[in-house]
Amino acid sequence: RAFAAAGQALQAFQLEDVSFHPYSSKFDLYIGNKIGGVLTPAEARGLKVFADPNGGNCASCHYQGAGLNGSTALFTDFSYEAIGVPRNAALPVNADPGYVDLGLCGPARTDHPPTPGNRFCGMFKSPTLRNVASRRSFFHNGIFHSLEQTIRFYNTRDTMPELWYPTVGGQAKATPDPDFPGYGLITTQYVGGQVRKFDDLPARFVGNIDTQMPLDGRPAHSKPPMSEQDIADLLCFLNTLNDKDVQPAEPPKPGACTS
């Protein structure tokens, strides 16, 4: 009992003493109503996109409010989600077509066997978004290397899956159509063929895929949840989550986040 009590005391100390969590981002100044914490119009709009259940809806998994004990927002609800991230061919383990990382169902874990109907297969933990703009790899397999591309995946995973997943069959166009975006993992446009959506998840677990906005399973080539302005504003807001001594991987262009 004494050992458990000592652990609880240490936990309380680490939660309450600011030296263990010296949050110094612009967002922290904003919520603390401190000097330097005034969000620009673009950042404020980005916060609205972040929280909008019909827009970015980022807050559904990356909760931006204080904890139950009043602790500073960690920008994660510590939940697990399956969102069908594309397979990363650059990983040596993926040279084996039979290898699949099922997250909670292994192979690194053994407490959730990958049996049909297991709703945990394909799920990975929602990470904190603090200092997210400083990262150069995203998701469990590091498939994306920019924050903007990651946001665009969320926005068009369902509306333009051909940008993110391989197409089987069909004929490659020598020159893509002018309206074919160049920001995806797949830069070749195909006529015909079948898009292998969720190519890193066995078909028996596709039912575990998250269907919350913006990943709501809307029809292909329909209007995506976020506009270009929404994406730009959201990027501006996410940059406010970097602590003052942390440099962004891709700093916003001068003036991009001011108005």
Question: What would you call each of these model-derived segments?
Answer:
Residues 1-259:
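Periplasmic c-type cytochrome electron-transfer domains
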